[in-house]
A protein has these predicted regions:
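Conserved, well-folded catalytic cores of nucleic-acid-processing
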Residues: 12-13, 33, 69, 83-86, ...
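Active-site phosphate-binding and catalytic loops of NTP-dependent enzymes
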Residues: 18-20, 35, 88, 147-154
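Glycine/charge-rich, flexible interdomain linkers and switch-proximal surface loops
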Residues: 26, 41-42, 46, 91-93, ...
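Anionic, Ser/Thr-rich low-complexity intrinsically disordered regions
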Residues: 95-100, 108-119, 128-140, 144-153, ...
Length: 189
């Protein structure tokens, strides 16, 4: 969520996602924090709750581009580690188990096929009554995966000690149960 918040900040400030220089110049103006209220995680960007603005394709694509920037990564790495030190957390992200929290007690590499993820994203848009182009969603997901797997700084990859959970053919309850089983197995050892 922090990378998405940074991406939202960059988009709101007209930053060109293909310009590493613009990203580096702008990123220091983003004050990102996480709060917890009634068991819900709330992402705060410069004093504003931005949870409802983080799940768009534009934000996801900018997050992928800006996350390749070493200055952005350094800025957010400190925030993420501090959050984990002060709280019991469940973090998701494309390099949590390899870079952010390499010593985490439980690591899960949750994945699904690009087609499955595109269908899920399209369903989100449909449920919100928002227009979407399935082929564009799929194309964006494939491009983002490629970009993230091949970036120089902290590429997307499964940590050696992470358990793979492929949710392509699973419903939400099945995914939750699979993750809980991994957690129980790791913690009860």
């Amino acid at each position: 969520a922090m990378y998405r918040a940074m991406a939202l900040y960059l988009l709101n400030h007209g930053v060109n996602g293909d310009s590493q220089e613009e990203i580096e110049t702008a990123c220091s103006g983003a004050d990102i924090s996480i709060e917890y209220k009634n068991g819900e995680q709330i992402v705060i960007l410069n004093g504003e709750n931005v949870n409802s603005m983080l799940r768009t394709e534009q934000v996801g694509n900018m997050a992928s581009k800006s996350s390749a920037n070493a200055k952005v990564r350094a800025h957010l790495l400190k925030l993420q580690r501090t959050l984990a030190e002060k709280n019991d957390v469940v973090m998701d992200g494309r390099d949590i188990g390899t870079t952010i929290l390499p010593n985490a007690e439980v690591k899960i590499y949750l994945t699904a096929s690009a087609d499955t993820r595109a269908k899920r994203r399209a369903l989100e848009y449909e449920q919100k009554g928002e227009p979407f182009d399935f082929n564009q969603i799929l194309k964006d997901i494939i491009e983002r995966d490629e970009r993230d797997m091949n970036r120089e700084v902290s590429p997307l990859k499964q940590a050696d000690d992470a358990v793979l959970v492929d949710s392509s053919e699973m419903g939400i309850d099945d995914v939750v149960n699979a993750i809980l089983n991994v957690y129980k197995e790791k913690v009860q050892k």
